[in-house]
Amino acid sequence: MRTRIGLIYSNPSAAYLSEFLLGSLEQSSLSGCQLVIEQCGGVESEREAIQRLAKGGVNGVILPAPLCDSRESLTAVEEAGLPAVLVASGRPAAGHCAVSINDFEASRAMTRHLLGLGHRRIAFINGHPNQTASGQRFRGFIEGMTEAGLSVDTDQVAQGYFTYRSGLEAAEKLLDTFHPTAIFASNDDMAAATMAVTHRKGLDVPGDVSVAGFDDTPLATTVWPELTTVRQPIAEMAREAVRLLIEQIRGRRGRAASQVVHRLQKFTLVKRDSTAQVKPFAAEKPTTRSKGKS
């Protein structure tokens, strides 16, 4: 009998989603499985989407972010009696297999990179508060700053939601109040928005403000200058999730005791043109400039 895998998504980032779907489809095809894709959101709840997948005869479900952290999704999967693999959760729920990177270490590595360029006035745009990866990335930023003997004040952290629009609002606030020499955004969408706001204010990236992101989606090489970011191997994480779910399904069919497995993928710090050495004295001088003036 051909294995059927369900994938349910509600990620607002088109760049992230396209890579994830591509990896899932490729591995499903290689494994001879049928991939059934469902979107939730709007009028349909996560529970309803998962119930429809279960009624359609899927043998297991993949839950990428943000659904991997949703109690509604996890409860629906458990009630349906389906094995699930959580992808990109910063703190995977007990009893479920997962694929992720070490968000804490990745964020700390990026913070260290900015510090190594001489930046001290580093601002941070956090991700959606309901996603556990956001908390891990924020912790990594705090740890990196603490290692350098620097405290983090509330005015150098802005709340985002992993969307371009939230990045615009967060960057506007940070540039107007904290005057950073570098901004580290929790994903590439918000980093791209930060660059747009910076340019609009007549500031140069990276001459006046360095900007860094997270994920290394195709957007990172579409913006100008190209974005320094953390590469999260999104497509490979999706492929690994399919492989892991197939193992779980086959184990159940063979009545083998299923093991909870958490597979960590490697992240990479990708240094491009949006970050540079801080200008002399810039760490102590507010970054302001009227648009159109040099």
What residues fall within each predicted segment?
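Hinge/beta->alpha junction and helix N-cap segments in small-molecule ligand-binding domains
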Residues: 9-19, 37-45, 67, 98-109, ...
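Alpha-helical recognition/docking segments in bacterial nutrient-uptake
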Residues: 2-112, 116, 174-175
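Flexible loop/turn connectors
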Residues: 172-293
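Short acidic capping loops at alpha-helix termini that bridge into adjacent secondary structure
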Residues: 120-121, 152-156, 205-210
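Glycosyltransferases and closely related glycan-assembly transferases
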Residues: 73-81, 143, 194-203
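Short helix-capping segments at alpha-helix termini
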Residues: 30-31, 80, 146-152, 175-179, ...
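Conserved hydrophobic residues forming the short capping helix/wall of the S-adenosyl-L-methionine
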Residues: 28, 144-145, 198, 249
